[in-house]
């Protein structure tokens, strides 16, 4: 009986190893399925976002276009502006500069609120960005975690799905990034640097001093890949 113990132990270890390999394979298949589903949902949202932005731009054009009215046959005599000695009155409200805008336009698409979409040509990425962050929302698209484009402190979080932010680690300084908001404004950025940071480094991400920050989990889940970007000067 004693001689059979090592053989039985070996069989148990082989069986346990096979179970672990099978579990890892099933986990890989599950993660791939989740990633593909997230990619399909993001693609569907992108179509809706582009359509919504186009509609808003058309509406804006119609609202700002001047009304053309045919002049009557007997037009009123033109006013002699040179003889008008009444001084124009300018109120304090008219002279004060408008307060800087801080809030981004939010539009609902497929039941969720979005602030626009991000494009990163270097890794062939085009993804919608939800207005608010949550674990459930991240399963669909990347989400705004902090800030806004207007205040140059936008932070976008995304899962490390293959169709989402898994390729952030491939970006290098100088790679271009663009963000299109729901008003049709396109903001151009360039990657400044990339770092691997702990999940607790919230302040370093939120108050980085950079105009745009993108981040995702590493495969271990213990750290974060963080990409810092800054606006590029218009050419």
Language model feature labels by segment:
Residues 1-9:
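N-terminal Lys/Arg-rich, disordered targeting/topogenic segments
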Residues 8-235:
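Solvent-exposed, non-transmembrane regions of membrane-associated and secreted proteins
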């Amino acid at each position: 009986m004693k001689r059979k113990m090592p053989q039985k132990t070996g069989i148990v270890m082989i069986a346990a190893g096979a179970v672990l390999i099978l579990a890892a394979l099933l986990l890989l298949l599950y993660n791939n399925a989740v990633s593909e589903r997230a990619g399909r949902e993001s693609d569907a949202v992108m179509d809706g976002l582009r359509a919504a932005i186009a509609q808003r731009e058309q509406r804006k054009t119609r609202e700002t276009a001047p009304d053309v009215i045919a002049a009557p046959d007997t037009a009123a005599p033109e006013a002699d502006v040179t003889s008008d000695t009444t001084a124009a009155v300018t109120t304090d409200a008219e002279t004060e500069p408008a307060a800087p805008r801080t809030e981004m336009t939010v539009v609902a698409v497929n039941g969720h609120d979005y602030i626009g979409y991000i494009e990163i040509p270097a890794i062939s990425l085009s993804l919608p960005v939800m207005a608010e962050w949550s674990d459930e929302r991240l399963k669909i698209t990347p989400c705004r975690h902090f800030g806004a484009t207007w205040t140059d402190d936008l932070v976008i979080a995304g899962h490390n799905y293959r169709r989402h932010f898994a390729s952030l680690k491939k970006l290098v300084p100088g790679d271009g990034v663009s963000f299109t908001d729901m008003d049709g404004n396109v903001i151009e950025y360039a990657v400044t640097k990339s770092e691997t940071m702990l999940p607790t480094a919230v302040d370093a991400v939120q108050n980085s001093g950079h105009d745009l920050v993108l981040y995702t989990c590493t495969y271990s889940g213990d750290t974060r890949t963080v990409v810092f970007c800054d606006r590029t000067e218009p050419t």
